[in-house]
Amino acid sequence: MAQSTQHNDDALRVSVLSEALPYIQSFAGRRIVIKYGGAAMAHAELRSAVFRDLALLACVGVRPVVVHGGGPEINQWLQRLEIPAEFRDGLRVTDADTMDVVEMVLVGRVNKQIVNGLNQLGTRAVGLSGSDGSLVEARPWGNGSHGLVGDVARVNPDVLEPLLEKGYVPVISSVAATPDDGRAHNINADTVAGELAAALEAEKLILLTDTPGILEDRDDPDSLIRKLRLSEARQLIEDGVVAGGMTPKTECCIRALAQGVSAAHIIDGRVPHALLLEVFTDAGIGTMVVGRS
């Protein structure tokens, strides 16, 4: 019985590799921008699975670019330093003291943890913030009522080109400065990932989230919509099917597709090896939004 089980396991592995082959061939040399955050960042086993997925993508010739958040660790440090955390309209209100913590955590801690984790697997990862080389230029979000919360004013992809050409994996924190006064701003990592994907003419934008994807019924995890056209995604927002925290993620995908990204994916980062399951299998595991059929 044990030998039979082993043969079945071996056959499954071979089948998975066989299914992945055409995708590996198709995406070799292509750029995929991945927003990494949520549960996949908070839990050690999921974190390890993401690092292995990224290492494998790089190993087979895909050019991954990682953009990360770090909300839970920011909250922990704010609490430790007795700085109150405030959220408004789903965004962190960021005064000067909070921004110091955000920059310390995202640039100095989380970014280096990801870089070190990837490098341990033989991946050549390089840590950057949006401020480095003016990779991302920020502008104040809205009317400035949220303090040092920013939006993307401009992306300079030339900073990343030599790294990608030489096989490095850029790991980017979503902190960037305004060009007029050089003040650091906290930008939503989904937004940074989407704008980078467009500027890099990426094949895919992938958002790791804490939900299965876009749901037809937000209270039913089995109502996953596996594929949408750009026009259908817009309609779901208008109809209120996409609401709450899924709205900015879907809008991020829409903007990226409108600027030339081939496909955008919203996937469940709580599933081990979600990246490989989405990129290298026929069924995928999340929602894929495409510009056309």
From Swiss-Prot:
Keywords: Amino-acid biosynthesis, Arginine biosynthesis, ATP-binding, Cytoplasm, Kinase, Nucleotide-binding, Transferase. It comes from Synechococcus sp. (strain CC9605). NCBIfam families: argB. Catalyzes the ATP-dependent phosphorylation of N-acetyl-L-glutamate. The record marks 35, 249 as: Transition state stabilizer. Its EC number is 2.7.2.8. Substrate binds at residues 70-71, 92, 186. It is found in: Cytoplasm. SUPFAM superfamilies: Carbamate kinase-like (SSF53633). CDD domains: AAK_NAGK-C. This is Acetylglutamate kinase.
